[in-house]
From Swiss-Prot:
Signal peptide coordinates: none
Bilayer-spanning residue ranges: 18-38, 39-59, 63-83, 86-106, 125-145, 182-202
The protein, known as: Ion-translocating oxidoreductase complex subunit E
Membrane-protein topology: Multi-pass membrane protein
Organism annotation: Escherichia coli (strain SMS-3-5 / SECEC)
Keyword Cell membrane: yes
Pfam families given in the database record: Rnf-Nqr
Chief place of localization: membrane
């Protein structure tokens, strides 16, 4: 159970692919102009990570070490092609919006990295969980950045959600404030870089505060009974 918890925590927070490893920045910065696009690409990446980790882990004993990377890439490309066809069939609007970034998941360092670092060494169940956790960590980072950029740039949230989730999702669209013209800085790549920088700074501050609290708690536990540590 502790190993399962560690895999989940590492994927979602401690070893977050976007905020710690800084992998997959090209789609992270290019696609997150809206929360809907960010959610769509994040879920596609999560599905690819989960399925490829599961497949590679299952086949790890039959994969020659000398040609493992080409085999990994072929497996990843097959899964990405299947996911691309699913999005094309059931969410065509999102498919048009994401464009080239769906097939580019094949070259995403996150997917190949987890295959080499985790799936090739661990069992199928734990590898699938690792892929799901890493994918959801990236999805959360994308959605936060996409939401911030959409709110600041257009004053809306989940605009076009029906392209991803169907016609019922039109009710998810929220107009936070009305604007006659979008704030282009937030919608263009410079805004993405600024937003990502703020998210990195925020995570650092949270980690430092949590570290300080753990240190203070450990110091209090180390004191003899009745002492508070105050002079």
């Amino acid at each position: 159970m502790s190993e399962i918890k560690d895999v989940i925590v590492q994927g979602l927070w401690k070893n977050n692919s976007a905020l710690v490893q800084l992998l997959g920045l090209c789609p992270l910065l290019a696609v997150t102009s809206t929360a809907t696009n960010a959610l769509g690409l994040g879920l596609a990446t999560t599905l690819v990570l989960t399925l490829t980790n599961l497949t590679i882990s299952t086949l790890r004993h039959w994969t020659p070490a000398e040609i493992r990377i080409p085999i990994y890439v072929m497996i990843i490309a097959s899964v990405v092609s299947a996911v691309q066809m699913l999005i094309n069939a059931y969410a065509f609007g999102l498919y048009q919006s994401l464009g080239i970034f769906i097939p580019l998941i094949v070259t995403n360092c996150i997917v190949v990295g987890r295959a080499e670092a985790f799936a090739a060494k661990k069992g199928p169940a734990l590898s699938a969980l690792d892929g799901f956790s890493i994918g959801m960590g990236a999805t959360c980072a994308m959605c936060v950045l996409g939401s911030l950029r959409e709110i600041i740039g257009n004053g809306t949230l989940f605009d076009g959600a029906d392209a991803l989730l169907g016609s019922w999702a039109k009710v998810l669209r929220v107009e936070i404030f009305h604007t006659d013209s979008p704030f282009l800085l937030a919608m263009l790549p410079p805004g993405a870089f600024i937003g990502l920088g703020l998210m990195l700074a925020g995570k650092y501050l949270i980690d430092e505060r949590m570290k300080k609290r753990r240190t203070e708690a450990a110091a209090e536990r180390a004191l003899p009974n009745g002492e508070t540590g105050n002079v």
